[in-house]
C-alpha cells in the first residue's frame, strides 16, 4: 500500500492513499457476480445475466459502495501499520481520476491523532464524596409537600416578588428596528423559578402591572435562531398580570380512611426509594466531575482543534433540533450559554476515560451489560420489548458496551484517588447551590 502523510496547520493530519485499480476492478467483479446469482433481470434467466448488463444497471451505486469500503479498509491498514491512534471520525476525500493511464486511484483522509496524554500523580488527587442522610421526618415532609394540593393563583396589584407568577408580552429590536416575527404574548412563568435568562428574572422584580421594561443582551454565536446570532438585541417587556399562589388541599386529600393510610405507606416507600436513587445519581455525577476536573488541572491535556470544532457542531445540531421540536422561547437560558465549556467537559471526559480503558486493557463484561439492560428495561411497561430491541440493534449494543467500559474506568479511578466523605443532611442537599452544577440536575 502506497501512502503519503502530511500535517496541515489548521486541518489536522492528512494522508493520501493509493488503491490499485486492479483491486477496485476485482472487488467490483465479485460484487457483480454476487448480484447476478441473486437477481433476475427481464430477458435473462436467474444467474445467467451478462456481467455487462449488471454493470450498466447497478454500476454507479455498486462502485460507490465498493470504493467506500476499500477506502475504509486501506485507511485502517494504514493506521495499523503506522501504529497510530486516532480520535473522532476521519473525513474521506476522493481525488478526481484525471489521468486515466494511472494504475491506481487516489484519495485523502483527514484525521486527528489521539492526544499524547499520560495521567500523572493520580494518587495525589483528593475529592469529596457527599453522603446524604434522609430521615423519616424528611420523607414525611416530602410527602406533605407533594401530596394532592390545588394551587390557586390570585391576581394582585402589588410589586413583583420572587415566586410570583407573572404574565408578559414582549417584542425585540436590533438597532432600534423591530423584528416582528419574534413578538410573543401571554408568556407566563414563576419568577426566580424558571429556565429563562437571569436578566429577565432580576429586571422584573419590584415592577407593577403595565410597567414596561427594557434590557439588552448579546445573542450567542450558536443560538438556534440564526437571524439573531452574534447580535445585540433589545427586549421590550410589558407586564400583563402578577399572581400570588394560594395552596388549598383538595377534598380528596382531606378524607381520612384506611385506604388512604395504605396509600400513604406505599407512597412513603416509593418516595424514599426515588429520593435515594436521585440523590445517588446527583452525588455520583458530582464526584465524577470532580475527578475529571482534578485530572485536567494536574495534567496538560490539549484538545485537538478538529475534534473540538466537530463536537461544537454536533452539540449545536442537538440544541437546534431540541429548540425546534419543543417550540422553545428565545428567552430560554440554555440557548444563551457558551457551548465551549460543555464541549470541553465532554471531550475531557471522553479522552481521560479512553486513556484509562487503553492503559488497563479493559473489556466489556457481557454479564454486566445484561444486568444493565434488565435494569433499564424494568422501567418500561413491556421490558421484553426493550431487551429484544437491544438484541437486534447494533448501535444500542455499542452504546451499552461503552457505558459498561466507562463504568469500569471510573471505578478504577475512584479506587486510585483519595476520597474524603462528607455527611450532609437532606436540608443541606436541597439548599446547596446546584445551579453551578446544572448538568447534575434531573
Curated annotation (Swiss-Prot):
Domain PPIase FKBP-type: 163-248
Domain notes: Consists of 3 domains; the N-terminus binds the ribosome, the middle domain has PPIase activity, while the C-terminus has intrinsic chaperone activity on its own.
InterPro entries noted in UniProt: PPIase_dom_sf, Trig_fac, Trigger_fac_C, Trigger_fac_C_sf, Trigger_fac_ribosome-bd_bac, Trigger_fac_ribosome-bd_sf, Trigger_fact/SurA_dom_sf
Species lineage: Bacteria, Pseudomonadati, Pseudomonadota, Gammaproteobacteria, Enterobacterales
Subcellular compartments: Cytoplasm
This protein's UniProt keywords: Cell cycle, Cell division, Chaperone, Cytoplasm, Isomerase, Rotamase
Any GO molecular function: peptidyl-prolyl cis-trans isomerase activity
GO biological process: cell division; protein folding; protein transport
UniProt EC number: 5.2.1.8
Protein name, per record: Trigger factor
Reactions performed catalytically: [protein]-peptidylproline (omega=180) = [protein]-peptidylproline (omega=0)
Origin species: Buchnera aphidicola subsp. Acyrthosiphon pisum (strain APS) (Acyrthosiphon pisum symbiotic bacterium)
Role: Involved in protein export. Acts as a chaperone by maintaining the newly synthesized protein in an open conformation. Functions as a peptidyl-prolyl cis-trans isomerase.
Encoding gene (name): tig
Amino acid at each position: 500500500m502506497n501512502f503519503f502523510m502530511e500535517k496541515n496547520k489548521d486541518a489536522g493530519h492528512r494522508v493520501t492513499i493509493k488503491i490499485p485499480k486492479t483491486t477496485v476492478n476485482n472487488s467490483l467483479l465479485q460484487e457483480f457476480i454476487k448480484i447476478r446469482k441473486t437477481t433476475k433481470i427481464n430477458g435473462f434467466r436467474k444467474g445467467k445475466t451478462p456481467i455487462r448488463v449488471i454493470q450498466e444497471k447497478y454500476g454507479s451505486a455498486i462502485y460507490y459502495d465498493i470504493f467506500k469500503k476499500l477506502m475504509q479498509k486501506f485507511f485502517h491498514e494504514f493506521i495499523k501499520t503506522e501504529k497510530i491512534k486516532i480520535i473522532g471520525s476521519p473525513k474521506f476525500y476522493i481525488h478526481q481520476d484525471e489521468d486515466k493511464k494511472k494504475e491506481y486511484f487516489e484519495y485523502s483522509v483527514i484525521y486527528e491523532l489521539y492526544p499524547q496524554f499520560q495521567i500523572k500523580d493520580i494518587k495525589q488527587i483528593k475529592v469529596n464524596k457527599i453522603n446524604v442522610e434522609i430521615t423519616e421526618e424528611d420523607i414525611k415532609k416530602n410527602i406533605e409537600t407533594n401530596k394532592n394540593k390545588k394551587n390557586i393563583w390570585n391576581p394582585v396589584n402589588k410589586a413583583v416578588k420572587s415566586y410570583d407568577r407573572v404574565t408578559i408580552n414582549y417584542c425585540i429590536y436590533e438597532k432600534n428596528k423591530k423584528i416582528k416575527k419574534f413578538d410573543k404574548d401571554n408568556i407566563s412563568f414563576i419568577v426566580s423559578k424558571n429556565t429563562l435568562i437571569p436578566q429577565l428574572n432580576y429586571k422584573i422584580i419590584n415592577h407593577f402591572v403595565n410597567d414596561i421594561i427594557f434590557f439588552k443582551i448579546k445573542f450567542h454565536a450558536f443560538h438556534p435562531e440564526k437571524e439573531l446570532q452574534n447580535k445585540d438585541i433589545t427586549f421590550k417587556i410589558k407586564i400583563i398580570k402578577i399572581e400570588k399562589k394560594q395552596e388549598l388541599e383538595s377534598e380528596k386529600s382531606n378524607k381520612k380512611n384506611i385506604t388512604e393510610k395504605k396509600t400513604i405507606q406505599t407512597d412513603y416507600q416509593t418516595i424514599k426509594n426515588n429520593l435515594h436513587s436521585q440523590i445517588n445519581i446527583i452525588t455520583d455525577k458530582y464526584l465524577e466531575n470532580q475527578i475529571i476536573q482534578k485530572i485536567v488541572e494536574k495534567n496538560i491535556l490539549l484538545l485537538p482543534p478538529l475534534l473540538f470544532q466537530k463536537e461544537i457542531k454536533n452539540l449545536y445540531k442537538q440544541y437546534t433540533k431540541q429548540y425546534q421540536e419543543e417550540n422553545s422561547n428565545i428567552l430560554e437560558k440554555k440557548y444563551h450559554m457558551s457551548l465551549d465549556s460543555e464541549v470541553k467537559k465532554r471531550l475531557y471526559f471522553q479522552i481521560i476515560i479512553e486513556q484509562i480503558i487503553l492503559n488497563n486493557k479493559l473489556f466489556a463484561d457481557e454479564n454486566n451489560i445484561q444486568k444493565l439492560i434488565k435494569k433499564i428495561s424494568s422501567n418500561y411497561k413491556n421490558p421484553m420489548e426493550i431487551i429484544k430491541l437491544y438484541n437486534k440493534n447494533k448501535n444500542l449494543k455499542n452504546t451499552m458496551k461503552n457505558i459498561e467500559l466507562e463504568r469500569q474506568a471510573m471505578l478504577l479511578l475512584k479506587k486510585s484517588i483519595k476520597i474524603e466523605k462528607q455527611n450532609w443532611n437532606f436540608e443541606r442537599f436541597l439548599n446547596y447551590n446546584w445551579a453551578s452544577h446544572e448538568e447534575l440536575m434531573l
